[in-house]
Amino acid sequence: MRIDILTLFPEMFAPLEHSIVGKARDKGLLEINYHNFRENAEKARHVDDEPYGGGQGMLLLAQPIFDTMDSIEQTKPRVILLDPAGRTFNQAYAEELAQEEQLIFICGHYEGYDERIKTLVTDEISLGDYVLTGGELAAMTMIDATVRLIPEVIGKEVSHTDDSFSSGLLEYPQYTRPYEYRGMVVPDVLMSGHHENIRKWRLEESLRKTYQRRPDLLENYNFTAEELTIFEKIKAEDTVD
């Protein structure tokens, strides 16, 4: 995968040189290019101006963004504008982006964008219902969530297919050594070696956690017959409590 990032602050992306994303680059599975669009600004390197019609703040000029985009080698990329008004990013979106050959992120600053910039864009994405100073932190979050889903980036595919949200449910509780710590012990089923019982326990705990913490995820969830039986049991237990 190739990722191009338009930003005024390339140095903010230093963390992408490390961890999973850095390893993906070392393996040749990922190429990341940074483009400081201030370098393409025409008037005294200014990248922003006051909005027509008045109003607070400054807007990013269209010209530096367009000229920078013209300089990037493109192979039918998804062009992503980081915008609080955009579609909310989630795991399903990350899985969708992981299938692409090229992603381009446009990171804004200041009050907003000249609307004409959006003619370059295929996706407007937000991390949530809040506003950040710029798009860089949002872009790094999306890149990390997406890159780890690229085949061969993580050693075992199960490492991410069992993640919270990948199945549509939150992940079940997990434990490691020691068996007992400060009076807290590992559930006996996990020590039993009985793989089918362990699978059923994990499924039940995953459904329980999702029901208790993120019931909204279950509104459109396609239950299997087994899951539905377990879920009805969980709801009945909750009613009794």
UniProtKB/Swiss-Prot annotation:
Endoplasmic reticulum is among the record's keywords: no
Signal peptide annotation: none
Binding site for S-adenosyl-L-methionine: G108, L127, G128, D129, Y130, V131, L132
Superkingdom to which the source organism belongs: Bacteria
One Gene Ontology term of the molecular function aspect: tRNA (guanine(37)-N1)-methyltransferase activity
InterPro entries in the record: Alpha/beta_knot_MTases, tRNA_m1G_MeTrfase_C_sf, tRNA_m1G_MeTrfase_TrmD, tRNA_m1G_MTases_N, tRNA_MeTrfase_TRMD/TRM10
EC number: 2.1.1.228
Keyword Aminoacyl-tRNA synthetase among record annotations: no
Cellular localisation: Cytoplasm
BP-aspect Gene Ontology terms: tRNA N1-guanine methylation
Pfam name, any one: tRNA_m1G_MT
Complex and partners: Homodimer.
Function field: Specifically methylates guanosine-37 in various tRNAs.
Family: Belongs to the RNA methyltransferase TrmD family.
Protein name as catalogued: tRNA (guanine-N(1)-)-methyltransferase
Organism: Streptococcus suis (strain 05ZYH33)
Phylogenetic classification of the source organism: Bacteria, Bacillati, Bacillota, Bacilli, Lactobacillales
